[in-house]
Regions:
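Adenosine-phosphate binding glycine-rich loop
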Residues: 36-74
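Short, hinge-like loop/turn segments at secondary-structure boundaries
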Residues: 6-7, 29-34, 57-60, 84-88
Length: 139
């Protein structure tokens, strides 16, 4: 879809949260700029809000070298598409960024108990799009 958007000078948006899609869109950045279009995966409720939080935190803590984010929802469920993508992705394992590189790790590579204010919840790492995007948006 991205090549067709570049060729037709049409902006590209989607609701994905997959690292591979961000990586591909980023690799096409110069072509998109030449076509005067925006390539923006992740316009759903997953990556753009958390990426904005990452930039906000970087502005408030400019000397920070690491970022750890967590979120929780009350009473909501993943969409059918999100659940399907998560199940399909289990075979690919987890991902983290270490020393500037995205590396493969086991599913739930790290677990942590976090107090979200409304409850203490067990959390785990997931291969979310922020692993790709936050690195670029926070430099």
């Amino acid at each position: 879809m991205i090549p067709a958007c570049i060729k037709s000078n049409t902006h590209y948006i989607d609701i994905t949260g997959e690292i591979s899609v961000y990586d591909y869109a980023y690799s096409k950045h110069n072509e998109a700029v030449s076509s005067n279009i925006v390539l923006c995966p992740g316009v759903g409720s997953d990556v753009i809000p958390t990426d904005c939080l990452a930039v906000f935190l970087k502005d408030k803590c400019p000397d920070a070298t690491h970022l750890s984010m967590a979120w929780a929802t009350i009473g909501s469920k993943p969409s059918k598409g999100t659940a399907k993508t998560a199940v399909e992705g289990i075979n690919h394992g987890g991902k983290v960024r270490k020393n500037g590189e995205i590396i493969s790790v086991p599913i739930a590579y790290k677990e942590r108990l976090i107090d979200f204010g409304f409850a203490e919840l067990n959390t785990m790492t997931i291969p979310w799009g922020d692993i790709f995007t936050a690195y670029h948006s926070t430099n």
